[in-house]
Amino acid sequence: MDHRLLEIVACPVCKGKLNYDKEKNELICKFDRLAYPIQDGIPVLIEPEARTLSSDEVK
């Protein structure tokens, strides 16, 4: 994941900051509790494609 991209992408729901989870290869929005997948190096920032984070994952 290109860290320069993290500086410009935002959560499509709340427009907030996304954090990269290297282990799961996802972009995380803690505010909306959503994890967006990264497929072939491309973030899939479509809400229906995101998975909901558990309360343990939000910490």
UniProtKB/Swiss-Prot annotation:
It holds the Pfam family Trm112p. GO terms for cellular component: cytosol. Gene3D superfamilies: 2.20.25.10. Belongs to the UPF0434 family. HAMAP family: UPF0434 (MF_01187). This is UPF0434 protein PBPRA2383. It comes from Photobacterium profundum (strain SS9).
